[in-house]
Amino acid sequence: MWLLQHRAAALFLFAVSFLMPVSHAHSREKTDIKTLVIVSHPYPERSVLTKGLQAAAESLEGVTVRNLETLYGYDTRQINGDAERKMMREHSRVVFIFPTHWFNITPMMKAWLNETWGSVGPGLWQGKEMLIVSTAAGGSATYGPDGRIGVSLADVFLPMKACALHAGMAWLPPLVFEGARSDRLPSYQHQLIERLKQ
């Protein structure tokens, strides 16, 4: 019985992550701002929401998507800081898509920032924009003034805000999905596409 349930769950995850298309109503749309999307998930084989959000971003013209685990695996020493800085210079907005991982960004995303921004002085990315897009399993029972940890999910991203402001970037209000569930993926994709088109 357990094996059948496990296989059914695996088939469902496959169908949701690989077969669920982004709505045709959104295809061929474009963003007016040249956008670099950095995607990371610590367990890509289990990713449903992050893969779905990546697919939504890829459906827009004017968006360049870089999945860190696809490019570099888990070897942080392989991150090419020079190439990543070149990508940053070629875009006006950077978007980070990731699941909230222990109240933080993912390990590969942190390594990417260290390699790419490690020598960034104040104002180096002046005039560019930063947007955080994140999913979190926890909802109001975890986040917010009455939640278990007593801080909002947006507060978890204050270090990223500090990075953006230090580098001279405009900090955009994060797009965060609390209590995230795979059956809500089409809504999350739609919200992301609408934000990227702004």
Where in this protein do the model-derived segments appear?
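Short helix-terminating capping/connector loops at secondary-structure junctions
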Residues: L124-Q126
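Glycine-rich phosphate/pyrophosphate-binding loop and the adjoining helix
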Residues: I33-L36, Q54-L60, D75, P159-Q198
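Surface-exposed cleft-lining segments at the edges of enzyme active sites
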Residues: Y72-D75, N104, P145-I149, F177-R181
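Short, glycine-/small-residue-rich phosphate/pyrophosphate-handling segment
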Residues: E129-L172
